[in-house]
Amino acid sequence: MLEIIKRLEYYAKVQPQSIALQIDDEIVNYENLYQKICDCTLNSPKFKLGCRVALLNDSPIVNITNYFVVLMMDGVPCFLDNKWSRDTIDKLIEHFHIEYVMTAIGKFKRTTSFGTYEKYISEQLKVDDLLHIGFTSGTTGLPKAYYRNEPSWIASYVENEKLIYNYEKALAAPGPLAHSLSLYTCIYALYSGRTFIGQRQFDAKRFISILNEQHSNIALFLVPTMLHQLLNVDTTITHIKSIFCSGAKLSESLFKTVSQQFKNANIIEFFGTSEASFITYNFNQTSPTNSVGQVFPNVSIKLEAQDNRKIGLLKVQSNMIYSGYVDVGVVQPHSWIETGDYAYIQNNQLYLVSRKSDRLIIGGKNIYPNVIEQQVKSLDGIEEAVVVGEPHRRFGEIAVLIYVGNQELDYTTLRRYLRQTLSRYEIPSKLVRVKDLPFTNSGKVARNTVQTLYLEGAFKV
């Protein structure tokens, strides 16, 4: 039996009336949650060990209850995002051999993949203590499915706990449970006997109101885009003690604003991926400006194919990594995995320079967009910046800066500023100011979408 199931049973006995889940105005205590899970398990049809079951309901409480029902029955829950198109959901069910779907509490419905058990079970059984199958939030193509086992998340909880200093009894994440960060937070809360606070759909004003009603200290887990929306709500909440932010680095100006509005909170920025889990942390921006933070003590770093500036492809090893992509092969604990980032490291601080797929080659030289973007975002009045490539006959491609800000950048002034730290090949050839930029579900700028829009002429130069 998984440790999380044992813990739910324990908390149902020793703190039965403690709130386990609060989603908007809906509240469930530990006793009722565990009893509902047990009742549904007893009344559900039996299936084979490791059978894959999709969770697809509008209610997070229904989904998380079904999550544990599937685990109690030795199945594998697969969290699907109900905001995906019907076509995407059908393709995922078929491609990854998901045999059942649960659209209501305790109710199983066979899918078109029913009977495909033998096609996937041999690989899946190589994963010890499998918790669920998650899906990446890619901007193009079908989301990738990956295995997440329980020991890797328990290891993450251990490291997370070291960064919580104020006895936070509630963990809040307003994002969908289909997203790794919110599901992680929910299971973390239940594993540690805390209250999980979430929402059906993110509403900054309503979320702040719910947090205001709490009587215990709170730790928030969210992405920068959501944090930015919370700042637009007038509030003086004093019992938010920790803000864990993942997905993209906070600009200095945004960090300052967050610090002023949530005066009693420590702000911890994580860098990591769905596959690698946590890699680095930046506590109250005490790390160097362009760094994504200090490497976690249980994470090892390796940089491959380094250039003369010691920039290389980032690989990580830890007890927090995933167990591999579905249908690609199982990754054993403590294996080295590639993140797809170019990076360098100094004094145990990690510096990202580009995604592998984002690197530009201008005049035969490797140019890393993130380096340019960080310099631009350090300017007053610049909210967001992304550098994309445009084909060029002479140089192969040139860099184009697309930015959001309350001021128009003067090219000559910007060039003079950037030349202090960047080479001439890294200076963007064109500047484009836009009102806003598209983001992924994980809170990152949708770079591929931005490049496509630019090349199609959607942005005016």
From Swiss-Prot:
| SUPFAM superfamilies named among the record's database cross-references | Acetyl-CoA synthetase-like
What is the enzyme's class at the highest EC level? ligase
- As recorded in UniProt, its EC number(s) are 6.2.1.-
Q: Which Pfam families match?
A: AMP-binding, AMP-binding_C
Ranges that cross the membrane: none
Q: PROSITE patterns per the record? A: AMP_BINDING
Give GO terms: molecular function aspect only: medium-chain fatty acid-CoA ligase activity
User: In terms of domain of life, where is this protein from?
Assistant: Bacteria
Which is a GO BP term held by this UniProt record? Answer: fatty acid metabolic process
> Which Gene3D superfamilies does its entry note?
3.30.300.30, N-terminal domain of ligase-like (3.40.50.12780)
Q: What are the UniProt keywords, alphabetically?
A: Fatty acid metabolism, Ligase, Lipid metabolism
What PANTHER family does the database record attribute to this sequence? ACYL-COA SYNTHETASE, MEDIUM-CHAIN ACYL-COA LIGASE ACSF2, MITOCHONDRIAL
Q: Would you identify the family this protein belongs to, as annotated?
A: Belongs to the ATP-dependent AMP-binding enzyme family.
User: Which protein is depicted?
Assistant: Putative long chain fatty acid-CoA ligase VraA
